Amino acid sequence: MHRRSFLQTAIALPLLGMPLFAGAEQADFWQRVFSAMSPMLAAHAHNPEHRVQVLAQYRKKGSRRWQKTGWQLTPGRWFSTASVAKLPMALLACEKIAAHGLGLDARIGFTQAPIGGEWPDAEPDFEVFARTLNRIFTISENPPFNRLYDFLGVDAMHARLTALGYPSARLISRMSAPVNDNARTRAGAVQDASGTVIFEFPERVGTVRTFALGEAKTGLGFLSDDGVLIDGPHDFSKANFIALADSQQMLKAIVDPDSVPAAQRWAIPEAMREQVLQIMARMPRQSVDPVYNPAEYYDGYARFFMIGDSKADKPGALRLIGKSGEAYGFLTDVSFITQDGSDLELLLSANIYVNADGIFNDDKYEYESIGYPFLAALGRAVWHTLNSRGHT
Protein backbone atom coordinates (compact mmCIF):
# COMPACT_ATOMS: atom_id res chain seq x y z
CA MET A 1 0.00 0.00 0.00
CA HIS A 2 1.24 3.49 -0.83
CA ARG A 3 2.22 5.74 2.05
CA ARG A 4 -0.69 8.10 1.33
CA SER A 5 -3.10 5.20 1.75
CA PHE A 6 -1.51 4.36 5.09
CA LEU A 7 -2.02 7.94 6.23
CA GLN A 8 -5.67 7.78 5.25
CA THR A 9 -6.45 4.45 6.90
CA ALA A 10 -4.28 4.34 10.02
CA ILE A 11 -6.70 6.29 12.18
CA ALA A 12 -6.75 6.46 15.98
CA LEU A 13 -9.74 7.63 17.97
CA PRO A 14 -9.27 9.97 20.95
CA LEU A 15 -9.55 7.99 24.17
CA LEU A 16 -9.43 9.64 27.59
CA GLY A 17 -6.80 12.15 26.44
CA MET A 18 -4.09 9.54 26.06
CA PRO A 19 -1.01 10.32 23.94
CA LEU A 20 -1.47 9.52 20.27
CA PHE A 21 0.93 8.86 17.47
CA ALA A 22 1.18 11.72 14.99
CA GLY A 23 -0.26 10.79 11.59
CA ALA A 24 3.01 10.01 9.83
CA GLU A 25 4.43 8.19 12.85
CA GLN A 26 1.28 6.14 13.17
CA ALA A 27 1.34 5.20 9.50
CA ASP A 28 4.97 4.17 9.84
CA PHE A 29 4.13 2.02 12.86
CA TRP A 30 1.42 0.06 11.04
CA GLN A 31 3.61 -0.29 7.98
CA ARG A 32 6.23 -1.89 10.21
CA VAL A 33 3.63 -4.16 11.81
CA PHE A 34 2.37 -5.45 8.49
CA SER A 35 5.93 -5.80 7.18
CA ALA A 36 6.57 -8.18 10.09
CA MET A 37 3.77 -10.44 8.83
CA SER A 38 3.82 -12.62 5.74
CA PRO A 39 2.73 -10.64 2.66
CA MET A 40 -0.24 -12.97 2.20
CA LEU A 41 -1.55 -12.34 5.71
CA ALA A 42 -0.71 -8.63 5.73
CA ALA A 43 -2.74 -8.18 2.56
CA HIS A 44 -5.91 -9.08 4.45
CA ALA A 45 -5.55 -5.93 6.57
CA HIS A 46 -5.89 -3.79 3.44
CA ASN A 47 -8.74 -5.75 1.86
CA PRO A 48 -12.01 -3.90 2.57
CA GLU A 49 -13.94 -7.17 2.32
CA HIS A 50 -12.32 -8.26 5.60
CA ARG A 51 -13.35 -5.10 7.51
CA VAL A 52 -10.23 -5.27 9.69
CA GLN A 53 -10.10 -2.99 12.73
CA VAL A 54 -7.22 -2.85 15.22
CA LEU A 55 -6.79 -0.85 18.43
CA ALA A 56 -3.62 -1.00 20.54
CA GLN A 57 -2.69 0.61 23.84
CA TYR A 58 0.71 0.00 25.36
CA ARG A 59 3.12 1.18 28.00
CA LYS A 60 6.27 0.31 29.87
CA LYS A 61 5.54 -1.86 32.88
CA GLY A 62 5.17 0.31 35.95
CA SER A 63 4.37 3.44 33.97
CA ARG A 64 1.02 5.19 34.28
CA ARG A 65 1.28 6.56 30.74
CA TRP A 66 -0.46 4.56 28.04
CA GLN A 67 -0.06 5.31 24.35
CA LYS A 68 -2.49 4.18 21.72
CA THR A 69 -2.82 3.72 18.00
CA GLY A 70 -5.50 2.32 15.72
CA TRP A 71 -5.97 0.89 12.26
CA GLN A 72 -9.17 1.45 10.26
CA LEU A 73 -11.36 1.95 13.32
CA THR A 74 -15.02 2.18 12.34
CA PRO A 75 -16.91 2.57 15.63
CA GLY A 76 -20.40 2.88 14.17
CA ARG A 77 -20.28 -0.23 12.00
CA TRP A 78 -21.99 -3.35 13.29
CA PHE A 79 -20.00 -6.55 13.66
CA SER A 80 -20.71 -9.72 15.57
CA THR A 81 -19.39 -9.27 19.10
CA ALA A 82 -20.06 -12.98 19.65
CA SER A 83 -18.42 -14.31 22.83
CA VAL A 84 -16.64 -11.04 23.61
CA ALA A 85 -20.01 -10.19 25.18
CA LYS A 86 -19.10 -12.67 27.91
CA LEU A 87 -16.44 -10.27 29.24
CA PRO A 88 -18.78 -7.56 30.56
CA MET A 89 -21.39 -10.18 31.47
CA ALA A 90 -18.90 -11.91 33.77
CA LEU A 91 -17.72 -8.65 35.33
CA LEU A 92 -21.25 -7.36 35.90
CA ALA A 93 -22.03 -10.62 37.69
CA CYS A 94 -18.92 -10.19 39.84
CA GLU A 95 -20.20 -6.78 40.87
CA LYS A 96 -23.60 -8.15 41.87
CA ILE A 97 -22.14 -11.05 43.82
CA ALA A 98 -19.71 -8.72 45.62
CA ALA A 99 -22.49 -6.24 46.42
CA HIS A 100 -24.14 -8.96 48.52
CA GLY A 101 -20.94 -9.67 50.42
CA LEU A 102 -20.31 -12.96 48.62
CA GLY A 103 -17.29 -14.34 46.80
CA LEU A 104 -16.57 -16.65 43.92
CA ASP A 105 -17.73 -19.64 46.00
CA ALA A 106 -21.33 -18.37 45.80
CA ARG A 107 -23.77 -20.53 43.83
CA ILE A 108 -26.14 -19.08 41.23
CA GLY A 109 -29.21 -21.05 40.22
CA PHE A 110 -32.83 -20.98 39.12
CA THR A 111 -36.28 -21.90 40.29
CA GLN A 112 -37.79 -21.73 36.79
CA ALA A 113 -37.17 -23.72 33.64
CA PRO A 114 -34.94 -22.22 30.92
CA ILE A 115 -36.66 -19.63 28.75
CA GLY A 116 -34.40 -19.96 25.72
CA GLY A 117 -30.86 -20.20 24.47
CA GLU A 118 -28.29 -22.95 24.84
CA TRP A 119 -28.98 -24.91 28.04
CA PRO A 120 -28.14 -28.65 27.86
CA ASP A 121 -30.05 -31.16 29.96
CA ALA A 122 -26.86 -31.80 31.94
CA GLU A 123 -26.52 -28.14 32.93
CA PRO A 124 -26.89 -27.91 36.74
CA ASP A 125 -29.63 -25.77 38.25
CA PHE A 126 -27.09 -24.26 40.66
CA GLU A 127 -23.41 -23.75 39.90
CA VAL A 128 -20.49 -22.29 41.86
CA PHE A 129 -19.75 -18.87 40.41
CA ALA A 130 -16.00 -19.56 40.07
CA ARG A 131 -16.83 -22.56 37.89
CA THR A 132 -19.13 -20.44 35.73
CA LEU A 133 -16.33 -17.92 35.19
CA ASN A 134 -13.84 -20.69 34.47
CA ARG A 135 -16.08 -22.13 31.75
CA ILE A 136 -16.48 -18.67 30.20
CA PHE A 137 -12.80 -17.75 30.02
CA THR A 138 -11.06 -21.08 29.38
CA ILE A 139 -13.06 -22.43 26.44
CA SER A 140 -15.89 -19.88 26.08
CA GLU A 141 -18.87 -22.13 26.82
CA ASN A 142 -22.27 -20.64 26.05
CA PRO A 143 -24.53 -21.91 28.89
CA PRO A 144 -22.58 -19.93 31.55
CA PHE A 145 -23.33 -16.72 29.64
CA ASN A 146 -27.01 -17.62 29.57
CA ARG A 147 -26.90 -18.35 33.31
CA LEU A 148 -25.53 -14.88 34.04
CA TYR A 149 -27.93 -13.26 31.56
CA ASP A 150 -30.89 -14.57 33.57
CA PHE A 151 -29.16 -13.76 36.86
CA LEU A 152 -28.58 -10.10 36.02
CA GLY A 153 -31.68 -9.17 34.02
CA VAL A 154 -31.69 -7.04 30.88
CA ASP A 155 -32.59 -3.65 32.34
CA ALA A 156 -30.14 -3.86 35.24
CA MET A 157 -27.32 -4.82 32.88
CA HIS A 158 -27.89 -1.85 30.62
CA ALA A 159 -28.38 0.63 33.44
CA ARG A 160 -24.98 -0.35 34.80
CA LEU A 161 -23.29 -0.36 31.38
CA THR A 162 -24.60 3.15 30.74
CA ALA A 163 -23.36 4.31 34.14
CA LEU A 164 -19.93 2.89 33.28
CA GLY A 165 -19.84 4.93 30.08
CA TYR A 166 -20.95 2.32 27.54
CA PRO A 167 -24.42 3.50 26.42
CA SER A 168 -24.19 1.82 23.01
CA ALA A 169 -23.26 -1.60 24.41
CA ARG A 170 -25.97 -4.20 23.89
CA LEU A 171 -26.30 -7.46 25.84
CA ILE A 172 -29.72 -8.28 24.46
CA SER A 173 -29.54 -11.91 23.39
CA ARG A 174 -28.76 -15.20 25.05
CA MET A 175 -26.32 -17.39 23.19
CA SER A 176 -28.10 -19.49 20.53
CA ALA A 177 -31.51 -18.00 21.28
CA PRO A 178 -34.32 -16.81 18.99
CA VAL A 179 -34.59 -13.03 19.03
CA ASN A 180 -38.05 -13.11 20.64
CA ASP A 181 -36.98 -15.00 23.77
CA ASN A 182 -34.57 -12.50 25.25
CA ALA A 183 -36.41 -9.69 27.05
CA ARG A 184 -37.72 -12.03 29.76
CA THR A 185 -35.35 -13.53 32.35
CA ARG A 186 -36.20 -16.24 34.85
CA ALA A 187 -36.35 -16.30 38.63
CA GLY A 188 -33.71 -17.86 40.82
CA ALA A 189 -31.56 -17.54 43.91
CA VAL A 190 -27.99 -17.18 45.09
CA GLN A 191 -26.59 -19.41 47.81
CA ASP A 192 -23.45 -19.09 49.87
CA ALA A 193 -20.85 -21.86 49.93
CA SER A 194 -22.86 -23.81 52.52
CA GLY A 195 -25.98 -23.85 50.34
CA THR A 196 -27.88 -21.26 52.36
CA VAL A 197 -29.99 -18.95 50.20
CA ILE A 198 -28.68 -15.40 50.62
CA PHE A 199 -30.97 -13.63 48.16
CA GLU A 200 -33.49 -14.36 45.46
CA PHE A 201 -34.17 -12.63 42.17
CA PRO A 202 -37.54 -12.55 40.40
CA GLU A 203 -38.63 -13.22 36.87
CA ARG A 204 -38.25 -9.95 34.96
CA VAL A 205 -39.35 -8.56 31.61
CA GLY A 206 -36.90 -6.01 30.29
CA THR A 207 -37.09 -3.27 27.70
CA VAL A 208 -36.59 -4.45 24.13
CA ARG A 209 -33.38 -2.83 22.91
CA THR A 210 -31.73 -2.76 19.49
CA PHE A 211 -28.42 -1.72 17.95
CA ALA A 212 -27.86 1.90 18.98
CA LEU A 213 -25.54 3.20 16.27
CA GLY A 214 -27.65 3.07 13.13
CA GLU A 215 -28.31 0.24 10.71
CA ALA A 216 -27.19 -3.31 11.47
CA LYS A 217 -27.94 -4.92 8.11
CA THR A 218 -25.13 -6.73 6.33
CA GLY A 219 -24.35 -9.69 4.10
CA LEU A 220 -26.08 -11.23 1.11
CA GLY A 221 -28.35 -13.72 2.82
CA PHE A 222 -29.12 -15.83 5.89
CA LEU A 223 -29.58 -19.60 5.99
CA SER A 224 -32.35 -20.44 8.44
CA ASP A 225 -31.95 -23.38 10.82
CA ASP A 226 -34.34 -25.40 8.66
CA GLY A 227 -32.20 -24.81 5.57
CA VAL A 228 -34.14 -22.02 3.86
CA LEU A 229 -31.99 -19.27 2.31
CA ILE A 230 -33.37 -15.80 2.99
CA ASP A 231 -31.92 -13.49 0.37
CA GLY A 232 -30.74 -9.97 1.12
CA PRO A 233 -28.84 -8.26 3.94
CA HIS A 234 -29.61 -9.73 7.35
CA ASP A 235 -30.81 -7.47 10.16
CA PHE A 236 -28.66 -7.96 13.28
CA SER A 237 -30.19 -5.08 15.23
CA LYS A 238 -31.36 -7.47 17.98
CA ALA A 239 -27.94 -9.10 18.40
CA ASN A 240 -25.36 -8.36 21.10
CA PHE A 241 -22.89 -5.60 20.31
CA ILE A 242 -19.92 -3.91 21.97
CA ALA A 243 -17.75 -1.45 20.06
CA LEU A 244 -14.10 -2.47 19.88
CA ALA A 245 -12.92 0.54 21.90
CA ASP A 246 -15.54 -0.16 24.58
CA SER A 247 -14.59 -3.80 25.04
CA GLN A 248 -10.93 -2.79 25.31
CA GLN A 249 -11.80 -0.18 27.93
CA MET A 250 -13.82 -2.77 29.87
CA LEU A 251 -10.77 -5.05 29.91
CA LYS A 252 -8.44 -2.20 30.84
CA ALA A 253 -10.68 -1.36 33.79
CA ILE A 254 -10.22 -4.84 35.28
CA VAL A 255 -6.50 -5.34 34.53
CA ASP A 256 -5.47 -1.78 35.50
CA PRO A 257 -8.29 -0.01 37.37
CA ASP A 258 -6.16 2.98 38.34
CA SER A 259 -5.68 3.92 34.68
CA VAL A 260 -9.38 4.57 33.99
CA PRO A 261 -11.70 7.22 35.45
CA ALA A 262 -13.23 6.26 38.78
CA ALA A 263 -16.69 6.12 37.18
CA GLN A 264 -15.51 3.37 34.81
CA ARG A 265 -13.96 1.09 37.42
CA TRP A 266 -15.68 -2.21 38.09
CA ALA A 267 -17.08 -2.37 41.64
CA ILE A 268 -15.14 -5.54 42.38
CA PRO A 269 -13.08 -5.95 45.57
CA GLU A 270 -9.34 -6.29 45.05
CA ALA A 271 -9.16 -9.88 46.32
CA MET A 272 -11.93 -10.92 43.92
CA ARG A 273 -10.32 -8.96 41.08
CA GLU A 274 -7.09 -10.89 41.52
CA GLN A 275 -8.99 -14.19 41.54
CA VAL A 276 -10.84 -13.22 38.37
CA LEU A 277 -7.60 -12.28 36.60
CA GLN A 278 -6.17 -15.69 37.48
CA ILE A 279 -9.20 -17.35 35.93
CA MET A 280 -9.00 -15.14 32.84
CA ALA A 281 -5.37 -16.15 32.29
CA ARG A 282 -6.00 -19.88 32.75
CA MET A 283 -5.43 -22.26 29.86
CA PRO A 284 -7.90 -25.15 29.32
CA ARG A 285 -5.24 -27.72 30.29
CA GLN A 286 -4.82 -25.91 33.63
CA SER A 287 -8.50 -26.14 34.51
CA VAL A 288 -9.44 -28.46 37.38
CA ASP A 289 -13.20 -27.92 37.39
CA PRO A 290 -14.23 -28.68 34.72
CA VAL A 291 -11.40 -30.78 33.34
CA TYR A 292 -10.95 -30.32 29.58
CA ASN A 293 -9.29 -32.63 27.08
CA PRO A 294 -6.19 -30.70 25.90
CA ALA A 295 -6.25 -32.48 22.56
CA GLU A 296 -9.59 -30.83 21.84
CA TYR A 297 -9.23 -27.69 23.93
CA TYR A 298 -5.65 -26.57 23.28
CA ASP A 299 -4.22 -23.26 24.49
CA GLY A 300 -5.16 -21.38 21.33
CA TYR A 301 -8.70 -22.77 21.22
CA ALA A 302 -10.28 -19.57 22.51
CA ARG A 303 -7.31 -17.21 22.19
CA PHE A 304 -6.51 -15.84 18.76
CA PHE A 305 -3.65 -13.38 19.26
CA MET A 306 -0.14 -14.86 19.34
CA ILE A 307 -1.16 -18.54 19.52
CA GLY A 308 -4.43 -18.98 17.63
CA ASP A 309 -2.75 -20.61 14.63
CA SER A 310 -1.18 -23.44 16.65
CA LYS A 311 -2.30 -26.35 18.81
CA ALA A 312 0.94 -26.32 20.79
CA ASP A 313 1.11 -25.12 24.39
CA LYS A 314 1.76 -21.40 24.64
CA PRO A 315 5.23 -20.27 25.73
CA GLY A 316 5.37 -20.35 29.51
CA ALA A 317 6.45 -16.73 29.78
CA LEU A 318 3.49 -15.46 27.77
CA ARG A 319 0.35 -14.30 29.60
CA LEU A 320 -2.92 -13.62 27.80
CA ILE A 321 -5.92 -12.13 29.61
CA GLY A 322 -9.07 -11.24 27.73
CA LYS A 323 -11.89 -12.61 25.61
CA SER A 324 -12.31 -13.66 22.02
CA GLY A 325 -15.39 -14.35 19.96
CA GLU A 326 -16.38 -15.88 16.64
CA ALA A 327 -19.71 -15.96 14.85
CA TYR A 328 -21.05 -15.52 11.32
CA GLY A 329 -17.55 -15.10 9.90
CA PHE A 330 -16.52 -12.39 12.38
CA LEU A 331 -13.49 -13.04 14.60
CA THR A 332 -12.65 -10.68 17.45
CA ASP A 333 -10.02 -10.75 20.18
CA VAL A 334 -9.63 -8.31 23.06
CA SER A 335 -6.54 -9.12 25.13
CA PHE A 336 -4.03 -7.84 27.66
CA ILE A 337 -0.66 -9.32 26.72
CA THR A 338 2.50 -9.51 28.84
CA GLN A 339 5.57 -11.70 28.81
CA ASP A 340 8.15 -12.48 31.48
CA GLY A 341 11.43 -10.82 30.62
CA SER A 342 9.76 -7.93 28.78
CA ASP A 343 8.63 -4.63 30.27
CA LEU A 344 6.00 -4.13 27.57
CA GLU A 345 2.32 -4.21 28.54
CA LEU A 346 -0.05 -4.37 25.59
CA LEU A 347 -3.80 -4.04 25.28
CA LEU A 348 -4.68 -5.26 21.80
CA SER A 349 -8.10 -5.54 20.16
CA ALA A 350 -8.94 -6.47 16.60
CA ASN A 351 -11.57 -8.05 14.42
CA ILE A 352 -11.73 -9.46 10.94
CA TYR A 353 -14.59 -10.66 8.74
CA VAL A 354 -14.04 -13.88 6.77
CA ASN A 355 -17.25 -14.81 4.98
CA ALA A 356 -16.50 -14.93 1.26
CA ASP A 357 -19.97 -16.00 0.13
CA GLY A 358 -21.72 -13.36 2.25
CA ILE A 359 -24.21 -15.92 3.57
CA PHE A 360 -24.69 -16.09 7.33
CA ASN A 361 -25.37 -19.26 9.32
CA ASP A 362 -24.15 -21.61 6.56
CA ASP A 363 -20.98 -22.55 8.51
CA LYS A 364 -18.85 -21.68 5.48
CA TYR A 365 -16.33 -19.23 6.88
CA GLU A 366 -12.60 -18.83 6.30
CA TYR A 367 -11.60 -19.09 9.95
CA GLU A 368 -8.85 -21.66 9.44
CA SER A 369 -7.40 -20.32 6.20
CA ILE A 370 -7.53 -16.58 6.96
CA GLY A 371 -8.99 -15.57 10.33
CA TYR A 372 -6.96 -17.50 12.89
CA PRO A 373 -3.62 -17.13 11.04
CA PHE A 374 -4.18 -13.40 10.56
CA LEU A 375 -5.00 -12.59 14.19
CA ALA A 376 -2.20 -14.78 15.55
CA ALA A 377 0.34 -13.16 13.24
CA LEU A 378 -1.03 -9.69 13.96
CA GLY A 379 -0.55 -10.19 17.69
CA ARG A 380 3.03 -11.35 17.23
CA ALA A 381 3.80 -8.52 14.79
CA VAL A 382 2.45 -5.77 17.05
CA TRP A 383 4.37 -7.21 20.00
CA HIS A 384 7.59 -7.49 17.99
CA THR A 385 7.25 -4.00 16.51
CA LEU A 386 6.68 -2.32 19.86
CA ASN A 387 9.64 -4.12 21.41
CA SER A 388 11.95 -3.39 18.48
CA ARG A 389 11.13 0.33 18.32
CA GLY A 390 11.83 0.82 22.02
CA HIS A 391 8.35 1.80 23.17
CA THR A 392 8.79 -0.38 26.24
Please give the residue ranges for each predicted region.
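N-terminal export signals
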Residues: S5-A24
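Structured C-terminal helix/loop/strand segments within mature extracytoplasmic catalytic/sensor domains
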Residues: E25-P39, L229-T392
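Beta-lactamase-like hydrolase cores
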Residues: E25-R77, A381
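Active-site-adjacent helix/loop patches that line small-molecule binding or acyl-intermediate pockets
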Residues: Q26-A36, P124-D256
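Second-shell loop/turn segments in exported
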Residues: T74-T81, E118-E123, T132-R135, P143-L148, ...
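Active-site SXXK
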Residues: S80-I108, L348
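Residue-level preference for non-acidic, small/hydrophobic
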Residues: K86-A93, I136, L161, S247, ...
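Short, glycine/proline-biased beta-turn/loop segments that scaffold the active-site neighborhood
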Residues: A99-F126
